[in-house]
Every structure is written in structure tokens, then in C-alpha cells.
Curated annotation (Swiss-Prot):
Membrane association type: Peripheral membrane protein
Protein's organism: Shewanella sp. (strain MR-4)
Record CDD domains: Syd
GO cellular component: cytoplasmic side of plasma membrane
Stated family: Belongs to the Syd family.
Source taxon at top rank: Bacteria
Subcellular location: Cell inner membrane
Keyword field: Cell inner membrane, Cell membrane, Membrane
Free-text function comment from the UniProt entry: Interacts with the SecY protein in vivo. May bind preferentially to an uncomplexed state of SecY, thus functioning either as a chelating agent for excess SecY in the cell or as a regulatory factor that negatively controls the translocase function.
NCBIfam families: PRK04968.1
Annotated disulfide bonds: none
Protein name per its UniProtKB record: Protein Syd
Membrane-crossing segments per the record: none
């Protein structure tokens, strides 16, 4: 079962929840990065938050280059989860706590995502662990949400460790268990992680790594 219908529904409910509760669209700090998602005027020099809506990509994002580079077939949901939309990260409440689903802000963000998924998968190979790829963060960035590449199930994972708990048998069922979380935009502190400099998806991963390192 594709995760796309569940993702479509969640993104629709997400924006409707903001409109119903706050009377406005969700906002996001783009840190100078343009996106088709932005509603209204955009000033690259401004550090203000922007209102945004998810935008369907004209051409589906593909991970064929990642598969070719690693000689690995990725679980099919990766193309629908990351390749259908341009969007900001979306916040959620769940039976397992609060968290954030990652999305792609623009084409440069998609390129950065691919490179970091390659890095994550190479780390798993080096550690002789089963392949996973990430879809979000849990508990304010303390843990990753990852997909088992062998069967599409969703797990909690701390970088460098084996996944610790299965949350759902599929990405679709995981998304269906979430509800939108209404919160003001947060401007994430820039942290010294050169490999994760792009402000779209990976501001979230900077925060996660910062939290993990700080707790060791």
C-alpha cells in the first residue's frame, strides 16, 4: 500500500487545522531559501517566517541515482514520501509523543536529502546493520523515525544504533496514526555541522545531532 493517500490526507488536514485554530496558514523560517510553497512575497534577505502551502511537484522526485550509487533497491515509499511535494517539515502528535515529518523545501533541499540518505545508508553498511532511511524526528529531535528498507515498517532509531522499536508496519499506517500539531514556527539555531548546512530538511537534523551529542 502506497503512503501517498495518507500523506495527501495528512497535509490537507495539517493546513485545515491551522486555518481552523489560528485563522492562518502554517509558517516556516526559510532562512533565505526560495520555494514554490511560499505564499505571498518573499525577500531572501529577510529572516522572517513565511506562510506556506504544500505544492505538488510537476515531476516526481526520483531516488534512482541513490540506488545506482549504492547498488541497492530502496523501498518504494521513499519516492512518494519525498518526491511528490515541496513542503516544509510538518509537526505531529502521536501515541509515541510529539515529532516532525520531514519534507523537501525546494530542489536544492532534495539534492541535500539524497546526499544525506546516501551518508546514512553508507553508515549502516559500515556498521553491518540492516538498511534504513529516515522520514522524521521524535521527541524534540532525540530520535529518528526510520523505515526498514526490507519491508517498509517504521521504527525508532538513534544514529549509530539498531532500530529499537517498531511503530507501524508501513509508512501509510504510521502517518494515519498521527494528528497535526499546532505550534508557532521555530527558528533553529545554526550549529557547526558542515555536512548538513541546507536549512530545509536538515535544520531539523542539526538539532537532533546537537541534542544527541549533548546527552552523551
Amino acid at each position: 500500500m502506497s503512503c501517498l493517500p495518507a500523506l495527501d490526507k495528512f497535509l490537507q488536514n495539517y493546513h485545515q487545522s491551522y486555518l481552523s485554530t489560528l485563522g492562518e496558514l502554517p509558517r516556516y523560517y526559510p532562512q533565505g531559501e526560495p520555494s514554490l510553497c511560499i505564499q505571498g512575497e518573499f525577500d531572501e534577505s529577510s529572516d522572517e517566517a513565511v506562510s506556506w502551502l504544500p505544492v505538488k511537484r510537476e515531476q516526481l522526485g526520483s531516488f534512482a541515482n541513490v540506488e545506482h550509487a549504492l547498488e541497492l533497491t530502496l523501498w518504494r515509499d521513499i519516492n512518494h514520501f519525498y518526491g511528490e511535494y515541496f513542503a516544509a517539515p510538518v509537526l505531529f502528535d502521536s501515541p509515541w509523543g510529539t515529532g516532525e515529518l520531514l519534507q523537501v523545501w525546494n530542489e536544492a533541499d532534495f539534492d541535500a536529502l539524497q546526499q544525506n540518505i546516501i551518508g546514512h545508508l553508507m553508515m549502516k553498511q559500515k556498521l553491518k546493520q540492516p538498511a534504513t532511511w529516515f522520514i522524521g524526528l521524535l521527541d524534540e529531535g532525540d530520535k529518528m523515525l526510520t523505515v526498514d528498507n526490507a519491508n517498509g515498517s517504521v521504527w525508532v532509531e538513534i544514529p549509530g544504533e539498531l532500530p529499537s522499536a517498531q511503530l507501524a508496519p508501513s509508512v501509510a499506517e504510521f502517518i494515519e496514526s498521527l494528528s497535526p500539531r499546532i505550534a508557532p514556527p521555530v527558528k533553529h539555531e545554526e550549529l557547526p555541522m558542515p555536512a548538513l548546512e541546507h536549512p530545509g530538511i536538515f535544520a531539523s537534523f542539526k538539532r537532533m545531532w546537537h541534542n544527541l551529542i549533548g546527552k552523551r
